[in-house]
A protein has these predicted regions:
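Active-site His/Glu-centered metal-binding helix of metallohydrolases
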Residues: 120
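Vicinal oxygen chelate
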Residues: 1-10, 17-117, 126-128
Length: 128
């Protein structure tokens, strides 16, 4: 089974480039919206493997709700990146204009990891 994350964000063209920088990915498939200003669907890959699909959100969402509500469940995108340098690059890129929930730290199950909500409202956990 192949599984990867789909995110719907405002400014999908910019977001896709941010995620390419963060994860060393490239856009390998893209369908633009009707006026060619955003992605209807784009696929990002690393070494030929799809890791993320990005599409334009149909309208702006109140990302601030994430900070105002107490959630009983949590969902986020988990990426094991394989090296401390890759984690640092992803963390630095994703935290630009975002909110750091957990800075890079050590856990019993991962020696170098962090959690951040990026400027598009997507929550990421990155680790080695």
């Amino acid at each position: 089974m192949k599984c990867y994350t789909q995110v719907y964000v405002m400014n999908s063209l910019e977001a896709a480039q941010t995620y390419c920088r963060a994860f060393g990915a490239e856009v390998t498939f893209a369908i633009m919206n009707g006026d060619e200003t955003a992605y209807a669907h784009a696929e990002l890959s690393v070494n030929g493997e799809g890791i993320l699909a990005v599409a334009e959100a149909p309208e702006a969402y109140d990302v601030g709700a994430i900070h105002r509500m107490k959630w009983q469940t949590m969902t986020f995108n988990a990426f094991e990146l394989g090296s401390r340098d890759a984690v640092r690059r992803a963390f630095d890129t994703l935290s630009e204009g975002g909110v750091v929930l957990e800075p890079i730290h050590e856990l019993p199950w991962n020696p170098y990891c962090a959690t951040v909500i990026d400027r598009y409202g997507v929550c990421w956990w990155v680790g080695v």
